[in-house]
């Protein structure tokens, strides 16, 4: 149901319920408390288009039989001026549900709405004026992005688009963990490669990174190459094998550039990159620790500084500063979230792997301990589970590029049709391969709820049939493009006139099912935004593509028919479907191809 129709029906029902309730209890209008009118789609299509349980809500306070009350509401509703424009039939079901069937005209109205709003169909300004920071990916600059980062990138970018579709001002942020032990390990690994060592050689660091990318960094460092991340200053290799700090700076810049390339191939952009090292340079970490000490939220024990996280729901207190004077990893996270708050982001969503679950209570406890007005439950978290990559029925655990894990770029290239084992730079692979791979990876990685484990099947991603969900959806769009092109050629049809076509011939069961699904798009986007559930978009697109294919494959619904009225109405329906498919695909960062 279109949002405008939903609002009208809610108003009609509210007025009707008030009328029936006042007549039933003889109370004054001033004393009447209106119940919440909730409209839902019945689980069984045969039960109608809209269901409402308001009679069951009111039965007890009105001391009425819910079925009898529901019938009174139905009778009064159908007598309301304008109700028959929307409601074709109404009936009472079960213990007192009110099931409504919409008129054909109400369902057909979605076509005009789509033509009028085009790429904005489904969008609203409901949440205009609200600001949200979404932090996602946030990888250590110690190697290429792995498939877990890819799931974060797909989820974060799609969620950003979903929230923006409802008017949110979305700030996308990537937090670089460019300080700490792992960065030191990166520097030592690169230094070892620069000295000519390889994994397994005598003198190779015990915890070093073994991927071939480390050898590439060392080679460029020794050659005096210049590298820079998209937001960073250029860094030139100093060629000095003994200068560990110069090696560290070069290696971090090199890998930040590599991660930029991964994100570019994935079609994901950020508004800001925030460096962990800046928290130390600006004194934010020390300031945060000092504030917690001053607030009485810490204590010394066995030479370490502890935070009283149990005061705010953690299962035990946590060490903040170790005996060697260094901070545990959650301390800069607390300082970082103070910075988010001070920048005015009262709504923050972090998308992280489920292995970060233990840090949530610690970060929130630290923020509460500061007593600076940050609400409990800040920030929000979306935790995703792991991704397993399968090919030829077997799990793929390593790649040449990373050495110990499958990278995002591997996944994009393989899903686009590149030969496994022939990994090369993105700019050396044809654009169509990257597009196909990006589309498959992005669609697949948001096609399940974040809190479920995901098996990414490379063989399935390469299939060009209905088993492949992204192909199934994209083919629906391309198929419609082909039909409309054929209509233009065969009947000299002017596509710009479709908005004025008479769509009243669209009365069949298949047509109505497709119209209903189109009208669900705005509500689906609002629900996805409210529930922070971008997977809902992928679910919807599969369902919409299914309704289209069912309609188009029905011989009774042939589009290329001699009857101009029927043909034009069906073409208008297809054109509206094409637009909604394109809108949904754009929301999750997937292309809508014209031909396949």
From Swiss-Prot:
It catalyses: tRNA(Arg) + L-arginine + ATP = L-arginyl-tRNA(Arg) + AMP + diphosphate. GO terms for molecular function: arginine-tRNA ligase activity; ATP binding. InterPro entries: aa-tRNA-synth_I_CS, Arg-tRNA-ligase, Arg-tRNA-synth_N, Arg-tRNA-synth_N_sf, ArgRS_core, DALR_anticod-bd, Rossmann-like_a/b/a_fold, tRNAsynth_Ia_anticodon-bd. It is an enzyme of class 6 (ligase). Its EC number is 6.1.1.19. One of its GO terms (biological process) is arginyl-tRNA aminoacylation. The keyword Nucleotide-binding applies. Its main location: cytoplasm. Keywords: Aminoacyl-tRNA synthetase, ATP-binding, Cytoplasm, Ligase, Nucleotide-binding, Protein biosynthesis. GO terms for cellular component: cytoplasm. It is found in: Cytoplasm. It holds the Pfam family Arg_tRNA_synt_N. A motif ('HIGH' region) lies at residues 139-149. Monomer. Belongs to the class-I aminoacyl-tRNA synthetase family. This is Arginine--tRNA ligase. It comes from Paraburkholderia xenovorans (strain LB400). The lineage of its organism: Bacteria, Pseudomonadati, Pseudomonadota, Betaproteobacteria, Burkholderiales. The gene is argS.
């Amino acid at each position: 149901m279109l949002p405008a129709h939903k609002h009208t029906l809610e108003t009609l029902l509210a007025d009707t319920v008030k009328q029936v309730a006042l007549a039933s209890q003889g109370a004054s209008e001033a004393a009447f408390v209106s119940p919440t009118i909730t409209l839902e789609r019945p689980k069984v299509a045969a039960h109608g288009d809209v269901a409402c349980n308001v009679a069951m809500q009111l039965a007890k306070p009105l001391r009425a039989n819910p079925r009898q009350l529901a019938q009174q509401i139905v009778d009064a509703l159908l007598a309301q001026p304008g109700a028959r424009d929307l409601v074709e039939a109404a009936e009472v079901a079960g213990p007192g549900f009110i099931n409504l069937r919409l008129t054909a005209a109400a369902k057909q109205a979605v076509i005009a709405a789509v033509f009028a709003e085009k790429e904005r169909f489904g969008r609203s300004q409901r949440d205009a004026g609200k600001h949200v920071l979404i932090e996602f990916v946030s990888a250590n600059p110690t190697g290429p992005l792995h498939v877990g980062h890819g799931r974060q990138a797909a989820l974060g970018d799609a969620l950003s688009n979903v929230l923006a579709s409802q008017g949110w001002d979305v700030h996308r942020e990537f937090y670089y963990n460019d300080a700490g032990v792992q960065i030191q390990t990166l520097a030592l690994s690169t230094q070892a490669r620069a000295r000519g060592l390889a994994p397994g050689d005598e003198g190779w660091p015990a915890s070093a990174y073994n991927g071939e990318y480390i050898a590439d960094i060392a080679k460029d460092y020794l050659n005096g190459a210049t590298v820079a991340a998209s937001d960073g200053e250029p860094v030139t290799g100093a060629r000095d094998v003994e200068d560990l700090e110069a090696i560290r700076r070069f290696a971090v810049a090199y890998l930040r550039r590599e991660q930029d390339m991964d994100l570019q191939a994935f079609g994901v952009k950020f508004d800001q990159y925030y460096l962990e090292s800046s928290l130390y340079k600006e004194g934010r970490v020390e300031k945060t620790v000092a504030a917690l000490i001053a607030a009485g939220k810490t204590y010394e024990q066995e030479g370490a500084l502890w935070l009283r996280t149990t005061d705010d729901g953690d299962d035990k207190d946590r060490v903040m500063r170790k005996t060697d004077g260094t901070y545990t990893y959650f301390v800069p996270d607390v300082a970082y979230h103070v910075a988010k708050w001070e920048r005015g982001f009262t709504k923050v969503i972090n998308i992280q792997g489920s292995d970060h679950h233990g840090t949530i209570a610690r970060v929130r406890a630290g923020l509460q301990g500061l007593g600076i007005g940050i609400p409990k439950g800040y920030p929000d978290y979306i935790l995703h589970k792991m991704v397993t990559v399968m090919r030829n029925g077997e799990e793929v655990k390593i790649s040449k590029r990373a050495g110990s894990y499958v990278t995002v770029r591997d996944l994009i290239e393989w899903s686009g049709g590149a030969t496994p084992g022939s990994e090369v730079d993105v700019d050396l692979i044809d654009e169509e391969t990257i597009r196909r791979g990006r589309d498959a990876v992005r669609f697949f990685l948001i096609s399940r709820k974040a809190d479920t484990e995901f098996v990414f099947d490379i063989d399935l991603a390469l299939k060009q049939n209905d088993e492949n969900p992204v192909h199934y959806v994209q083919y629906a769009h391309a198929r419609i493009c082909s039909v409309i092109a054929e209509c233009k050629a065969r009947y000299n049809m002017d596509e710009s006139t479709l908005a004025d076509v008479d769509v009243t011939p669209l009365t069949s069961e298949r047509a109505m099912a497709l119209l209903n699904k189109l009208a669900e798009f705005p509500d689906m986007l609002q629900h996805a935004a409210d529930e922070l559930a971008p997977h809902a978009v992928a679910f919807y697109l599969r369902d919409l593509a299914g309704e289209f294919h069912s309609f188009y494959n029905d011989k009774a619904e042939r589009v290329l028919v001699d009857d101009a009225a029927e043909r034009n109405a069906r073409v208008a329906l297809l054109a509206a479907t094409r637009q909604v498919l394109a809108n949904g695909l754009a929301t999750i960062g997937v292309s809508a191809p014209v031909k396949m």
